Amino acid sequence: MRVNRIKQKLKNGEAVYGIMIKEAHNVNIAEILEIAGYDYFVIDMEHAYYDMSDIADILQYARKTEITAVVRIPRLDYAYVAKTLDMGAEGIWVPHLDTVEEARNLVAFGKYPPEGKRGAAVPVFRQKERQEFKQAADYFRAVNEETLLIAQIESREAIANVEAITAVAGIDVAMMGTQDLSLDMGLPGQGSHPEVKAAIQRVVDACRKNGKASGNHIPGIDELRYWTGQGMRMITHSYETNLIIEKGREVLKALKG
């Protein structure tokens, strides 16, 4: 069975580095990002214009490479979680996860029984993997073990509940949503404000206490380095569009002298 490489690295205490995509639709984006050296990429269905048919081919292609494909779904919903996993996603990232009940529902939707209530399915791309197991129970247990579940923390309510959220069995990562958190705190765009940083530190500390990984998704390299130094281990840098824009400007500046 295919190993979820970033989940394994996180379990081993290692840091993993990824990028979010919002415009790329060609399946080769997976291989391009793999060649660039990323551990994973995240398909953004919350803010970008992807639907289920758009992401299916990208997810299938990614499974032929060594990069891990994660999907940020639009909201916590059984159909989004189960169908995206059935299409080949190795991780589910849920935005605006604020409560313990929502964390438990994410686990219920994303895991087969007895850990959850995900409906049994063996998609075509998993047929060979299924044949590796004599017992169905062993197969479904293995799939559960390789599924990464990410709760995005981006409100004052979520910060207040973060210790309990990260204590939920099956939640692997608490991912910061710094922009939305700063908005909710009345400090829009001030990710480095002392109050915002203190709130983010609560997430890092809760994850450390409960044996989970913490992460962040922001464009600032210096900020990401700071939080890596504080113990964050799932580092999602910006978007593929920003990468192209920034590199393009850099190259043109050099060419024009």
Question: Model-derived features: where do they sit?
Answer:
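C-terminal helical cap(s) of enzyme catalytic domains, especially alpha/beta-barrels
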Residues: I58, V100-G116, T228, T241-G257
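Conserved N-terminal beta1-alpha1 strand-loop-helix module at the mouth
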Residues: M1-A69, L76, A108, L149, ...
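Hydrophobic faces of well-ordered beta-strands that scaffold small-molecule active sites
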Residues: V16-I21, F41-I43, A69-I73, I92-V94, ...
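Alpha-helix-loop-beta-strand connector modules within alpha/beta enzyme cores
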Residues: M52-D86, A108-G116, R141-N144, S192-G215, ...
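Glycine-rich tight-turn/loop motif centered on a GG-T
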Residues: A89-G91, Y112-F125, D184-A198, S238
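Catalytic cores of alpha/beta
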Residues: E31, V71, L76-E90, V94, ...
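N-terminal amphipathic alpha-helix/helix-capping segment at the start of soluble metabolic enzymes
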Residues: M1-M20, F133-E145, Q201-R202, R208-K209
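Conserved anion-binding
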Residues: A79, G91-A169
